[in-house]
């Protein structure tokens, strides 16, 4: 088996380590053994010397001789690191000059829309499951715990994808890993619309979340490396508009597709493709279109230069220059750059020979090598010279996510709560009624019947909705083709009564006494209650919430390079905290919608500034990795926020409001300890 070799990220191993040791030592030992032949006893021959075992004194002397060589190796390593840092600093300033020469024009705007679609796919993913659930729960007969897991699994997938794919983008390239990310999302999101079982649907949404989770870190790192210092803050903020567009797109598609139950088909009695599945496929379109368009875009030249690929990077920069100059009407302008500084390479992967081991072993070695490189890179972000910036950013990302995602879930839940309270206030109560020989074939809704007596009554082809029969006596009654939602019989006596083709299952009769009563041919299917109302208001709330961030996006884009990143983060988070206190006055649906729009509109500026400063604080070989770590932590904060805030709906508004406000104030003040990056070149 041929030997395979790879050089470590930081080349910290001396040549004398086990993987690089040669046979010279054995040859010396054999020679030493030969020399001792024929010596007399006065030579103090060491026992075992004839077996080639070196004397302890010889070992000590060898170690003494090797110590300087190890020190030289470490010194050379330090010199190499210092030289590389000088090269990177020189490259950063030279690259800034080159990007200025290339100009900002058609190429950047084309890339802007391609990457914007990828960011839009991330925004869509947040809403897909929540919009599809009211219809999907009926098809899959989902309990509350299963619905909660579906909402959770998307964030878990996005968290894992941000960690993994963000790290890979710093090793394999922005374009390659982003294409992989979008392909995973598009394929598994589409597949999830066809699968019938809950487990398969859950798995597909998990993998889809992993795919799209890597898009946001890569998109911002990728686009920033084509922007000059003067344009970076503004245009990265403009890019954030596409995340808002994703929410608008998902809301509009849900509004226009899901209520149309005829938009589907059935194959036999077991396979049903309903309108919510059409909605899931439509939501995969942004990722699909972005993936196809990305094929025509080049790799980041800044990344290629970091990898030592000078010629390829030069060709791409020339393409950027020529594209922009042609669009400006000056095609004769020549790209004057002939040579670009490339950093000293310290990380090299040597391809394994095809004759080395089996295909499985070769791929395993490749995987372990890449994994080690990504892991070391992540540790360098957390424990290296950037650890303090990473810690501060982690706190800011987490507090922002906890409050923002927590409140964006709390708003629609509170609106539902207000709807339920209003509905309950209109409930009709019938006490001691006596009905004899009646035929009832209309809908009974939102009623309570107590201590009544129904004799020889027929309930035919009717619908019970939120109806409670309590301490009621049924005698010689007949129920046929009856459907129900949230309907129960409590402490009732049911005598000589027949139930034919109904969904009044046994769990709907609580402490009831049956006398000579029969159940015939009960309805098949799910035995759970689901609301029949469409979620028009929830779609509208999400639509308005997404649309409300547009003014904040525009303002943050125009002011990002004027007032700086830190003032934008701190100011936006503090203003958002003040807006939280207005929620105490949100005692109706319309008021809650208005305060939601205000909160989303003020907080978006902090998100945009966070994206920009995260990109600018880290060098090229750690940029996507650090962004992925922080974005993964953001999704963890979103999970906690959703769980904590939802648990207080209908109980108290004080805890969610104070928690959100405190998180925003704390995060905004801590963010001021970060360095300002407005005048900084990309390292």
Swiss-Prot record:
Phenotype caused by lack of the gene: Mice display no particular phenotype. Single knockout mice survive significantly longer than wild-type mice upon exposure to C.botulinum neurotoxin type A (BoNT/A, botA). Mice lacking both Sv2a and Sv2b experience severe epileptic seizures and die immediately or shortly after birth similarly to mice lacking only Sv2a. Single knockout mice bind reduced amounts of BoNT/A than wild-type mice. Single knockout mice are significantly more resistant to C.botulinum neurotoxin type E (BoNT/E) than wild-type mice.
Cytoplasmic side: 1-110, 170-182, 227-237, 299-390, 557-565, 614-626, 673-683
Carbohydrate attachment residues: 441, 491, 516
SUPFAM superfamilies, alphabetized: MFS general substrate transporter (SSF103473), Pentapeptide repeat-like (SSF141571)
Bias type Basic and acidic residues, positions: 1-10
GO cellular component, as recorded: acrosomal vesicle; synaptic vesicle; synaptic vesicle membrane
Any GO MF annotation of the entry: transmembrane transporter activity
Top-level taxon in the UniProt lineage: Eukaryota
Extracellular-side segments: 132-148, 204-205, 259-277, 412-535, 587-592, 650-653
Modification Phosphothreonine, positions: 36
Segments crossing the lipid bilayer: 111-131, 149-169, 183-203, 206-226, 238-258, 278-298, 391-411, 536-556, 566-586, 593-613, 627-649, 654-672
Subcellular location: Cytoplasmic vesicle, Secretory vesicle, Synaptic vesicle membrane; Cytoplasmic vesicle, Secretory vesicle, Acrosome
UniProt note on tissues of expression: Expressed in ribbon synapses of the retina (at protein level). Expressed in diaphragm motor nerve terminals (at protein level). Expressed in hippocampus neurons (at protein level).
Cited InterPro entries: LD_SV2 (IPR055415), MFS (IPR011701), MFS_dom (IPR020846), MFS_sugar_transport-like (IPR005828), MFS_trans_sf (IPR036259), Sugar_transporter_CS (IPR005829), SV2 (IPR022308)
Region: Disordered, residue numbers: 1-73
Assembly notes: Interacts with SYT1 in a calcium-independent manner. Forms a complex with SYT1, syntaxin-1 and SNAP25.
Family recorded in the similarity comment: Belongs to the major facilitator superfamily.
Protein name: Synaptic vesicle glycoprotein 2B
Organism: Mus musculus (Mouse)
Gene assigned in the entry: Sv2b
């Amino acid at each position: 088996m041929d030997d395979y070799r790879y050089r470590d990220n930081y080349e910290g191993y001396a040549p004398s380590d086990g993987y690089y040791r040669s046979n010279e030592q054995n040859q010396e030992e054999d020679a030493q053994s030969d020399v001792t032949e024929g010596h007399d006893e006065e030579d103090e021959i060491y026992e075992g010397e004839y077996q080639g075992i070196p004397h302890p004194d010889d070992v000590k002397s060898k170690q003494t001789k090797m110590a300087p060589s190890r020190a030289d190796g470490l010194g050379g390593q330090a010199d190499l690191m210092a030289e590389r840092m000088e090269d990177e600093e020189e490259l950063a300033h030279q690259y800034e000059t080159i990007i200025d020469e290339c100009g900002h024009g058609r190429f950047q705007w084309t890339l802007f829309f391609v990457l914007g679609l990828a960011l839009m796919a991330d925004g869509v993913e947040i809403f897909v499951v929540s919009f599809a659930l009211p219809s999907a729960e009926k098809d899959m007969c989902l309990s509350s715990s299963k619905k909660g897991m579906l909402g959770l699994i998307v964030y878990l997938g996005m968290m894992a994808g941000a960690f993994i794919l963000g790290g890979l983008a710093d090793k394999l390239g922005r374009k390659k890993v982003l294409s992989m990310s979008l392909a995973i999302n598009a394929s598994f999101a589409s597949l999830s619309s066809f699968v019938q079982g809950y487990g398969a649907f859950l798995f597909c949404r998990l993998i889809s979340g992993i795919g799209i989770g890597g898009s946001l870190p890569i998109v911002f790192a990728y686009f920033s490396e084509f922007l000059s210092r003067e344009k970076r803050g503004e245009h990265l903020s403009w890019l954030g508009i596409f995340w808002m567009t994703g929410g608008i797109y998902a809301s509009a598609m849900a509004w226009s597709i899901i209520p149309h139950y005829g938009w589907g088909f059935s194959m036999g009695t077991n396979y049903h493709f309903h309108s919510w599945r059409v909605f899931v496929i439509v939501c995969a379109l942004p990722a699909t279109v972005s993936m196809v368009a990305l094929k025509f875009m080049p790799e980041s030249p800044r990344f290629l230069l970091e990898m030592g690929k000078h010629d390829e990077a030069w060709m791409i920069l020339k393409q950027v220059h020529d594209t922009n100059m042609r669009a400006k009407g000056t095609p004769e302008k020549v790209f004057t750059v002939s040579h670009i500084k490339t950093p000293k390479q310290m990380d090299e992967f040597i391809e394994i020979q095809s004759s080395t081991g089996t295909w499985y072993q070769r791929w395993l070695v490749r995987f372990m090598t890449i994994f080690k490189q990504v892991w070391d890179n992540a540790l360098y972000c957390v424990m290296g010279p950037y650890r303090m910036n990473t810690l501060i950013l982690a706190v800011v990302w987490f507090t922002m996510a906890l409050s923002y995602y927590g409140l964006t879930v709390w708003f629609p839940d509170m609106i539902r709560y207000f709807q339920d309270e209003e509905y309950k206030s209109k409930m009709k109560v019938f006490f001691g009624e006596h009905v004899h020989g009646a035929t009832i074939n209309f809908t009974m809704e939102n009623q309570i019947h107590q201590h009544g007596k129904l004799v020889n009554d027929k309930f035919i082809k009717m619908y019970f909705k939120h109806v409670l029969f309590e301490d009621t006596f049924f005698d010689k009654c007949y129920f046929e083709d009856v459907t129900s939602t949230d309907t129960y019989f409590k402490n009732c006596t049911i005598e000589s009564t027949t139930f034919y083709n109904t969904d009044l299952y046994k769990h709907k009769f609580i402490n009831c006494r049956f006398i000579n009563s029969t159940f015939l041919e009960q309805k098949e299917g799910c035995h759970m209650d689901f609301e029949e109302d469409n979620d028009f208001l929830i779609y509208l709330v999400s639509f308005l919430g997404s649309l409300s961030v547009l003014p904040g996006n525009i303002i943050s884009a125009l002011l990002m390079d004027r007032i700086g990143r830190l003032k934008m983060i701190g100011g936006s988070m503090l203003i958002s905290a003040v807006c939280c206190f207005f929620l105490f006055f949100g005692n109706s649906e319309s008021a809650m919608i208005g305060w939601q729009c205000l909160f989303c509109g003020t907080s978006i500026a902090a998100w945009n500034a966070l994206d920009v400063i995260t990109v600018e604080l880290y060098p090229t070989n750690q940029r996507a990795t650090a962004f992925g770590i922080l974005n993964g932590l953001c999704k963890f904060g979103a999970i906690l926020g959703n769980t904590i805030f939802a648990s207080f709906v209908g109980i108290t508004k004080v805890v969610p409001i104070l928690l959100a406000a405190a998180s925003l104030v704390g995060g905004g003040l801590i963010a001021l300890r970060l360095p300002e990056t407005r005048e900084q070149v990309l390292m």
